[in-house]
């Protein structure tokens, strides 16, 4: 257990550095579900209906992700929130959108059908820790560009021992003073769960345009040096209870991204129904191939 925590937290400290400015909201509203294997098609169909309703009637927006490495059939839906007040406002807007699109009774049935697709679900409200994040975008446009161009996300949940939160944060800030001087570092987002979990949990998340972006990252020894690395290992044993790492890929077909993110890569975030178009084209071609001129028809 300790060894696993040590190696997962290697990622945490190596990725933490200063923040330029708040780019998009102070909170992340996160909904995580595990879908029954036999219900995947129903789950996707219902989600796409919710997407259509929220688009047409100005409801909520979100980014959907699917597990690549981690527990199977797990999906995460993440929305930005400015504050608690906006959570209420957006929830009301999403409910109103569903009622307008489907009617109250049909909307409630769809919600029951959706829940029947799930093995379990969990909601978390996470506060962005800009003071612990590294190389975050300087403004909303840069943030939208980073998210819009990303295709995979690695996130590590770090569970801190009771009474050691201050020590944990202090060490991260100390380590980042060294880590931020390293030239080969990428943006990293740190958040802390404030609603919906036991104990104290931090999430450290990194984005890449492909899995290859995780190759050839600097090691902890490269960043901290031998003495700093030893200090890190000691702190990790004393302050960290457990860690869990998950790798997700973005799911554009289940997302309803904010327009500023979608227009960065419209072909990805708003995929065209190419399968339906291709099927129609093949059917037409097949019909044409199967038809013969009257003169060529065999005589009866």
Annotate each PLM feature.
Residues 1-4:
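N-terminal secretory signal peptides that target proteins for export/translocation
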Residues 6-7, 295:
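Sequence-pattern detector for short linear motifs
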Residues 22-230, 235-300:
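Short S/T/G/P-rich N-terminal loop/turn motif that feeds into the first structured element of a domain
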Residues 7-18:
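Bacterial N-terminal signal peptides
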């Amino acid at each position: 257990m300790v060894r696993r925590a040590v190696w997962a937290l290697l990622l945490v400290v190596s990725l933490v550095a200063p923040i330029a400015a708040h780019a998009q909201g102070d909170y992340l509203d996160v909904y995580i579900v595990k879908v029954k294997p036999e219900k995947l098609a129903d789950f996707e169909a219902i989600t796409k209906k919710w997407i259509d309703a929220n688009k047409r009637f100005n409801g909520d927006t979100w980014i959907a992700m699917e597990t690549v490495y981690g527990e199977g059939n797990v999906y995460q839906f993440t929305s930005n929130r400015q504050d608690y007040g906006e959570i209420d406002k957006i929830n009301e807007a999403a409910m109103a959108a569903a009622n307008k699109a489907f009617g109250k009774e049909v909307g409630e049935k769809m919600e029951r059908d959706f829940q029947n697709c799930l093995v379990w679900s969990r909601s978390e409200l996470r506060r962005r820790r800009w003071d612990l994040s590294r190389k975050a975008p300087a403004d909303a446009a840069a943030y939208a560009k980073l998210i819009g161009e990303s295709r995979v996300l690695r996130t590590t949940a770090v569970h801190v021992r009771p009474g050691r939160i201050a020590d944990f944060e202090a060490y991260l800030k100390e380590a980042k003073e060294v880590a931020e001087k390293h030239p080969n570092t990428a943006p990293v987002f740190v958040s802390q769960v404030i609603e919906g979990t036991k104990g104290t949990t931090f999430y450290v998340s990194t984005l890449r345009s492909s899995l290859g972006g995780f190759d050839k990252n600097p090691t902890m020894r490269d960043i901290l040096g031998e003495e700093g690395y030893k200090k890190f290992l000691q702190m990790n044993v004393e302050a960290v209870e457990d860690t869990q790492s998950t790798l997700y890929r973005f799911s554009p077909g289940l997302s309803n991204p904010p327009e500023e993110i979608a227009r960065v890569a419209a072909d990805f975030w708003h995929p065209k129904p190419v399968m339906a178009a291709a099927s129609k084209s093949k059917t037409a071609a097949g019909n044409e191939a199967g038809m013969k001129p009257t003169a060529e028809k065999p005589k009866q």
